[in-house]
Swiss-Prot record:
The keyword Metal-binding applies. Its cofactor is heme. Heme binds at C448. It comes from the Eukaryota. SUPFAM superfamilies: Cytochrome P450. InterPro entries: Cyt_P450, Cyt_P450_CS, Cyt_P450_E_grp-I, Cyt_P450_sf. This is Cytochrome P450 76A2. Its EC number is 1.14.-.-. Belongs to the cytochrome P450 family.
Amino acid sequence: MEWEWSYVFFSAIIILPAFILFFSQKNTTKSSYKFPPGPPGLPIFGNMFELGTEPYKKMAVLRQKYGPVLWLKLGSTYTMVVQTAQASEELFKNHDISFANRVIPDVNQAHSYYQGSLAIAPYGPFWRFQRRICTIEMFVHKKISETEPVRRKCVDNMLKWIEKEANSAEKGSGIEVTRFVFLASFNMLGNLILSKDLADLESEEASEFFIAMKRINEWSGIANVSDIFPFLKKFDLQSLRKKMARDMGKAVEIMSMFLKEREEERKKGTEKGKDFLDVLLEFQGTGKDEPAKLSEHEIKIFVLEMFLAGTETTSSSVEWALTELLRHPEAMAKVKTEISQAIEPNRKFEDSDIENLPYMQAVLKESLRLHPPLPFLIPRETIQDTKFMGYDVPKDTQVLVNAWAIGRDPECWDDPMSFKPERFLGSKIDVKGQHYGLIPFGAGRRMCVGLPLGHRMMHFALGSLLREFEWELPDGVSPKSINMDGSMGVTARKRDSLKVIPKKA
C-alpha cells in the first residue's frame, strides 16, 4: 500500500478546507470512544505513509509495541487490525456477525460489480443465497469428486506446456512455473462453469477474456486514494475506476457472448452437459429470502468473480510452496521420496494419492502459514458499534485481519519464522477456519466458499509438478539467495516470480 505523494498532496490542496471541517466533526463525534492502541500518525493523512509496500509486515512489527489489536487512521478511514491468534479467535467466535459486512472498494463500483459480488456483498439474504448455491452446486465433496477428470485434463495440459517451455528455454535459465499453474486453474474453472477452455490462445474471445480478467485483477490490487479519502471518489485521480470500467466492460461483453451462445445451444439441444452456468440460468427461487430468478447482470458478475477468486490464490500458493521446497533441499528430498514410495512407477499423480501423502500436505500447510495468499483477509466492516477485547469499535469501521502476522504469532507457533513442515505431522490443525492461528482462507461466516475446490487443486497441481519433474535453480542462483519479498496486490505473490529449471523425472 505504497501511496503516490503527488496524488495525495494534490488532493489535499484542492479540498483542504473540507478536510479540516470533516476531521473536526469526526473527532468531536468519536472523542468519547476508547479505541485500541496505535501510532499517532500525521494530521489529515494519519498512518498511511508508515506502511510501505508490504503493510502486513509493518503492522506485524507494530504488534510488539501495541499488542494483539492495532488502531490506524488511513486518511479519513478508521481501521482496526487483528494481529494474533487470540484476537482472531475472539473475532470469529464471539463477534462474527458484528464484523460481517464488507468494505466496497471504489474500483468495484464499475459496472455495479459489487451488487452481484459474493466476496464484497453486504451481509444479508442475497449474500446467503449466493453462498448456498455455490456450496451446493460446486463445492460439496460429491461435486468436487465428480470434477476430477476436468482437473486431470487441465493439469496434464499444464505439464505439457511446462515441458515445451523448458525445452525451448536457453540452457541454464529458468521458466516461470506459476504462469502455467494460473492457466491450468483458469481452464479448470472455465470447464466447470462454462464447459470451455478459456486460456486457449487460439480462440480470440477466450484470449480477450483471459487478458481482461488479468487486468481486472491488476486494478483491484492497486492501493487507491479514493478508498482512504472517500470524498475524492468523483475525481478518480489514479484513473483506476476508468481502467476497471474498461476491462470489466470487456469481460462483461464477452460474458454476454457466452450467454448468447448458451441460449442458442439450449434451443438447439446441443449442450455438452450441465455446468454451473446452466445452474444459474435455470434457477427458480421463492422470491422471499432468495430471488425468484437471477438477472443476466447478476449471472455475469457471479461468473466473473469465480474466475477472479479461484486463479490467483491457487497459482500464488503453489509458487510459494515450490519456492520453500527449493530453499530447503532436505524438505524437497523428503516430499519427493514420499511421493515416489506412494505412487508406483509410470503412474501419474491422482486425486486419491493426496490422503496418502501427509508430508506433502504438511508442506502446503506450512507454506500457507508463512505465505497466506491474502496476507490481509478481505476487509470487513462493522455492522454496529461493538465492544471488542475491551475497546470501542464504531459502526462502519474497516477491520483488517492480518493473516500473515497471525501465521507468525510467537504465542501460537514455536520458531514461527522457520519453515518446518514437520510441525503438522500427527497434528489435526488444518486451514478450514477452525484453528485460529492458521486462517489463510479466513474463518467464520465469510471464509472463502471455494476453499474445498481450491485446496484440492493446490495439492493436485503441486503433487503433479513434484511427480513429473526434478527441479533446479537457474545458473547463479542458490537456495538462500532466492528473493522472498512479496508484492501487495489482490494476492501476495512473490515480488520476483520464481524461475526454475524443470527436468523430466
